[in-house]
Structures are given as C-alpha cells and as structure tokens.
Amino acid sequence: GGILKFNPKNPRWEERDRFIISKGHGAISLYPILADLGFFDKSELGEVCKESSFLGGIPDTMIPGFETINGALGHGLGVACGSAVALKNKNSAAKVFVLMGDGELFEGAVWEAIMFAGHHQLNNLILIIDNNKISMLDYCRNIIDLTPIEEKLHVFKWKVKTIDGHNIEEVYDSLNSLKEDKSDHPRVLIANTIKGKGVPKLENDVLCHIKSLKEDEIIKAIEELK
C-alpha cells in the first residue's frame, strides 16, 4: 500500500516500520491481511483460536507480523514510545504506528506516554485513535467524557489531524502525509468511526462490542456490507 515498510519473508527486518495494535481485541481482523501479504499460509485462517493454532484472540509476538503481546488495554502507546526512542538512538528512518481505541484514553498510563512522546519530540511516532465513542459496556461519555480530545493532545505537543475513519482514501492520504511530515512533533490521527457501521443490527450499539452473532445473523450482516 506504500505506507508501512515491511518484509513478509523477514518479519524482524531491522528497518521495518513497526505497527502496534494496542486495541488487541482487533488482532483477529489483521490475520487475513497478514496471510494475504505472505506472513503465513492462508490455511491457518481456518484454525483461529483452536488449541493447535498459533493464531489466538489477541496479538502475540509468535505470530509473524505482530510486534507485541497484548493483554490489558492501554499499554501499546507506552511500548511504542520505547520503540520510537530506540529507533531514534539508532538513527533509523523507521516509523512506529500505533492503533488505539478511544476507550484506552481512560488509562493514566496512556497520558503518561502522550506527555513523554511530546516532551521527547518523538516525530517517528504516529498514533491512530479509533474514535467510535463506545467502550466495552457503555458510551465513553457516560464513563469518562474524553472531549475535546484534539485540544488535549495539542497541549501535549502533538500534531493532530481528525478525519472520517470510514473514508479509506482520506485515511490513506492522511497517514501518508503524517509519515512524511518533517516537524518535531509526534503525530496523531483521530479517526471518527461508528461501531458496527453498515450492519443495522450492530451500528452504534454498545453491546456489539461483545455480542456474538448467530449464523443466520452473520450471513445477513455480510449481505448488508456488500
């Protein structure tokens, strides 16, 4: 796609760009992409979450293409800061990308990482916030009101851009622009999204975060997304 530098035949290539998925429960959505790119055989996709498979429900470094092991949310950005500092110390041109859910902003460790990155001018760090405004069991505004996110990040010396997270062309162009930016600031792309978009039964429904669909509902959802 032209944004991330990587080598499926050598996943630990030193000059690769790092992609850290902090919202680890989204890892399963990356498996088909990694298989398409050649990180592992597509036949493995039929074994996801089985005892014999290395493809589990959350990221793991034993999976080619993943940089971190994820458990509790809120740790990805701190790890990314460490990677960004290490790459700077090596004078590497590689970038560190992090995908984080907006609910992770409830965690104090995230704001420590935000302050750290701004203070140390980690301009090789690009954060993407999936701003769907829903946490596991409620709307974010009912748990801790995060607004205005943009102003908060500006104060901590981040370069901020807000986009429609469902507009793929806008996502691509914005990431490319932030990667090529020469300023001394870490960058953040706030992607406004709607959870479950395109499937009426799930769209903007708090419970769709943890809801399992029946087989007939899955078939219907696939048709609605076409």
Stretch-by-stretch model annotation:
Residues 26-27, 37, 132, 168, ...:
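Short, glycine-/Ser/Thr-/acidic-enriched flexible segments
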